[in-house]
Amino acid sequence: MVYLDSSSLLKLLWPERESEALRSHVATEEAVIVSSLAELESEVQLKAAWLAGRYRGSRWRQFRTKLAEFRDTDPFRFQSLPGAVFQTALRQHRAERRTHCRTLDRLHLAAMEELNVSRLITHDANQAEAARAMGFEVLMPGVQVTP
């Protein structure tokens, strides 16, 4: 089981350099958790890109349809988050020896804890660093990691 954050979820919707490697990796997983946070954040990013003129309304609707189709596609498992995720995020933030990360990234890490998932697929380097500092396994399909 692995948690898919919005940076990676978006790469499954529109083509980017890492998209093919990500698709191939996702196909090998038994369960890919998509939280309500990742779904919301992805929807917001899709709409923002449309409103900024990156693509037409018809393409935006196609992206939203594809995202909705993931709900009925293996290996995706869409999960709602409990309200406790905010307290978990605050506790993580306040903990000593943790790497700083942005609020939404912190909420993804709290979601992982709340959903009892220890593996993360992300394409966000800052979030990856914070996740590793917390002991999570981080996967970044298609990204060359330099030692």
Regions found by a protein language model. Name each.
Residues E29-V32, P75-R77, E114-L120:
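Short active-site oxyanion
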Residues R17-E20, S24, F70-F78, A128-A133:
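Noncatalytic, solvent-exposed loop/strand surfaces
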